[in-house]
Regions:
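Cys/His-rich zinc-coordinating modules
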Residues: 417
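Bacterial Sec-dependent N-terminal signal peptides
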Residues: 1-18
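Transmembrane beta-barrel domains of bacterial outer-membrane proteins
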Residues: 100-109
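Disordered, low-complexity segments in secreted/periplasmic proteins that are enriched in proline
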Residues: 32-77
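Feature marking well-ordered beta-strand scaffolds used for ligand recognition
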Residues: 74, 133-135
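Surface-exposed loop/turn motifs in large extracellular/passenger domains
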Residues: 80-95, 110-128, 139-160, 169-187, ...
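C-terminal segment of classical bacterial N-terminal signal peptides
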Residues: 22-32
Length: 471
């Protein structure tokens, strides 16, 4: 994930960019994380498939979320250290009190196919990580670390006061951690709550997660993807770039409450997903939900996916509820309350990632049994599609500045659009055929005659004044 977590990482990035400026070459692969035992080598920057933006590093660090693939190398599982190590064995432990104080040392490490059951224990961590990549990708310096092993955790209290000290970290496709009744509090930077990489999995329930540092998402995945599945969570993050959820893998949250006072609600990067159900989450900075691709190598190229059902999402910033850049993305909403300070529902545009003039977005928003409000915008190299399905009602304008490369809308018979400003659509489809479920409110919706041959260039009067007319 892209945000650079430490001063060392900023220095490394600055050097890399200086080389790029003077030589035209970005020394990207020279500082990737080394693979941990049983894990693939860290991905290098990929060429995107046809139809997606070409990637190049921007002149600055990526935005809110997680840090990226510049910096020192990671370590193999055999090189990692901890106050307590279970190495290829099966153990059941209870009532431990462990305090790891040395740099790069975890409190508890299970590795090499080990299996541990740990209950009723307190683990704490001080002492910074010496390598951002090692802590971000292979879990160095985490409070509890599972590397290609299994762990069952219950009734634990985990605290850290160090940079690069994630709480529970699962790395490797053979790593699975189950956790129940866990309390987590991390105080410094790059110290997330639950974090998985390289196909690792965490399944957690009844978790209480507080993070205070920068780049400390409560629920996270990093390089090589990972899976984090959580039920019943209480989340509080306060640092810059520390959303409630940051995914370069697959993250599911059911029955959760949370606030990110220094960041967005949630971020998906690349071909990855966030699935929310019965949650109440609030973000305070920049946007509500961010869907993007940085091309740092941490997230595969493809469609970013976000869904929320039976939930409440509150965006306290003045930015859009959905911000999409440099990727193809889809969001699906059902019976979810959206609360926001600003007047923009969606903005699909170019940002600081990707290649100039090829770094727009392509976004589809699907809504069922849903109330939506706000304008939908896209720039001249971006496409946006709104699908209003049964019992979806939207009050807003589509492409009111007539800037989008494409702006499309479809409505089922039981959907409705309350138009708030003149709008310009590329294609429009409506099950009613007479567009009686579009309330014009005196505004004109212009459609592309060439892209809507079935409308034959006709003008249709809309309810409450206004019209649908060819352009």
């Amino acid at each position: 994930m892209k945000l650079i977590h430490s001063i060392k990482k900023h220095h490394t990035l600055a050097i890399a960019l200086a080389i790029a400026v003077t030589t035209g070459f970005i020394p990207y692969g020279t500082s990737q994380a080394a693979s941990a035992a049983g894990q693939p080598q860290a991905m290098t920057m990929q060429a995107p498939p046809d139809g997606t933006p070409n990637g190049e590093l921007p002149p600055g660090p990526p935005p809110d979320g997680m840090p990226g693939g510049h910096g020192q190398s990671g370590k193999s599982a055999s090189e990692l250290t901890a106050s307590q190590v279970v190495d290829g064995q099966t153990q059941s432990l209870t009532g431990l009190t462990l305090n790891a104080t040395a740099a790069d040392q975890s409190a508890f490490l299970v590795r090499n196919g080990g299996s541990v059951t740990l209950t009723g224990s307190t683990l704490s961590k001080t002492g910074d990580s010496s390598s951002a990549d090692a802590s971000n990708f292979s879990g160095q310096n985490a409070i509890f670390l599972s590397s290609n092993s299994t762990a069952s955790l219950s009734n634990l209290n985990l605290t850290s006061n160090a940079d690069g000290a994630n709480a529970i970290f699962s790395t490797g496709k053979n790593s699975t951690v189950t956790a129940d009744h866990i309390k987590i509090h991390t105080k410094n930077n790059s110290s997330r709550g639950l974090d998985s990489t390289y196909g690792g999995t965490i399944q957690a329930s009844n978790v209480d997660i507080t993070t205070e540092g920068a780049h400390c998402a409560a629920l996270a995945t990093d390089r090589g993807e990972g899976n984090v599945i959580v039920k019943d969570a209480r989340i509080a993050t306060s640092g810059d770039g520390s959303p409630c959820v940051y995914s370069t893998g697959n993250i599911q949250l059911t029955n959760g409450q949370g606030e990110a006072t220094g960041s967005e609600i949630a971020v998906v990067e690349g071909k990855n997903s966030i699935t929310l159900q019965k949650v109440d989450l609030t973000g305070y900075k920049k946007h509500g939900i961010m869907l993007y691709q940085s091309f740092s190598g941490d997230a595969s190229v493809g469609q970013a996916t976000f869904s929320a059902k039976d939930s409440k999402l509150t965006n306290k910033s003045d930015g859009p509820m959905f911000y999409i850049t440099n990727t193809k993305a889809t969001a699906t909403l059902e019976n979810t309350q959206l609360v926001q300070n600003g007047d923009t529902l969606v903005n699909v545009t170019s940002g600081q990632w990707g290649k100039t003039d090829k770094n727009g977005g392509n976004f589809t928003l699907n809504a069922t049994n849903q109330t939506l409000k706000g304008k939908i915008l896209a720039n001249n190299i971006s496409q946006v599609t709104l699908n209003l399905k049964d019992h979806a009602v939207w009050t807003g304008s589509l492409n009111e500045d007539y800037a989008a490369d494409q702006a499309n809308i479809s409505l089922t018979r039981q959907a409705a659009w309350n138009v708030t400003s003149d709008s310009y659509v590329t294609t429009i489809t409506d099950e009613t055929k007479d567009f009686s479920n579009i309330i014009g409110n005196g505004h004109t919706v212009y459609y592309s005659k060439a892209d809507n041959p079935s409308l034959q260039g006709k003008t249709f009067n809309l309810r409450n004044g206004g019209k649908l007319a060819a352009k």
